A protein has these predicted regions:
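Carbohydrate-associated surface elements
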Residues: 138, 159
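Conserved donor-binding/catalytic core segment of Leloir-type glycosyltransferases
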Residues: 133, 177-195, 201-204, 208, ...
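A short, histidine- and acid-enriched strand-loop-helix "catalytic/donor-clamping" loop
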Residues: 12, 63, 91-93, 102-118, ...
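A short helix/loop element that forms part of the nucleotide-sugar donor recognition site in Leloir-type
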Residues: 165-179
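Nucleotide-activated donor-binding/catalytic signature segment of Leloir-type glycosyltransferases, i.e.
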Residues: 182, 217-219, 226-247, 251, ...
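Acidic donor-binding loop of glycosyltransferase active sites
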Residues: 257-272
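Short His-centered aromatic/hydrophobic patch
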Residues: 85-91
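N-terminal strand-loop element at the rim of the active site
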Residues: 6-13, 19-64
Length: 284
């Protein structure tokens, strides 16, 4: 049996959630697994449809970390475990086991100045696991520069689930939403400084003069949502930008299919970097 420890898992939405779901689902086809994940209000129906066991841990964040670790440590003591796979070094920080440990790295969570407390904590975990799975060569080089043992790092690019054939009704709905709009630009991602929605909106102000029917479709949610909408209003681009949130995967995929260009000019913002832009792969 393998244990999967994650802080991001469906039915919550996002790239990391999709990644951890895909990893767990595929692993369950070859091994018995148990997933320890964060509590989500709508988790019951999702969990009941899964072919593997999922244990949800809720409560106040600062206490949840310790409660989750205690549950996992007890489970390891009482069961025959082959190994532990974690989405983040923090997920392994309090786990006590001599079994095989594998930790994924993505970039942002390890990008701390050498010698700082966070850097030392990350290295304390990553240099004591069996394998560090890097999502890209960029992330591997970043990890090495931060002090991670190069010999432990293996690069495995994240995969995506094949998209099912889109139904005609959803495609028709997306076409109606975008009627008479051209060209059609789209970004599917969290509203985060790193994703650089602001740059696209600033560019849109100039493109509007050349393409009066241009539209920019934003699908996602996040901390920067209000700032992005405020900028759109300040530049009088309400008619050129469409915001979508909490929509079905079918509609999201249909909007991508009916768009002309997928745009996401990511930048480095403080310690936040794009280790592997899985959104580009999903769009392709």
């Amino acid at each position: 049996m393998y244990i999967v420890i994650t802080r991001t898992f469906p039915p919550d939405v996002g790239g990391m959630q999709n990644l951890m779901w895909g990893l767990s689902n595929e692993l369950s086809k070859h091994h018995m697994i148990k997933v320890f994940a964060e509590y989500h209000d709508n988790h019951k129906n999702f969990d009941n449809d899964c072919s593997f066991s999922i244990e949800r841990v809720g409560g106040i964040k600062i206490f949840r970390k310790y409660r989750k670790a205690n549950l996992i440590n007890e489970f390891i003591k009482e069961n025959k475990i082959e190994g532990v796979i974690a989405d983040h070094w923090k997920s392994l920080e309090l786990i006590k086991t001599t079994k095989k440990k594998i930790c994924l790295i993505h970039s942002k969570e390890i990008n701390h100045p050498v010698g700082t407390n966070l850097n030392k904590r990350a290295l304390g975990v990553l240099n004591n696991v069996d394998y560090v799975i890097s999502n890209s060569l960029y992330t591997k080089k970043l990890a090495i520069s931060c002090g991670v043992n190069e010999k432990k790092i293996i690069i495995i690019n994240p995969g995506v689930n094949p998209i099912k054939k889109l139904d005609k009704q959803t495609l028709k709905k997306s076409e109606e939403l975008l009627k008479n709009k051209y060209p059609r630009l789209i970004t599917v991602s969290r509203y985060d400084k790193r994703k650089n929605h602001e740059k696209i909106i600033m560019t849109l102000r100039n493109l509007k003069q050349i393409y009066p029917n241009i539209v920019y479709i934003c699908v996602g949610y996040g901390d920067e949502e209000e700032n992005i909408k405020k900028l759109a209003n300040e530049l009088n681009l309400q008619n050129q930008i469409m915001f979508f949130k909490d929509i079905s995967n079918n509609l999201k995929n249909a909007l991508v299919a009916k768009s002309n260009i997928f745009v996401m000019p990511s930048i480095i913002h403080k310690s936040s970097v794009e280790g592997f832009g899985i959104a580009y792969t999903e769009a392709a």
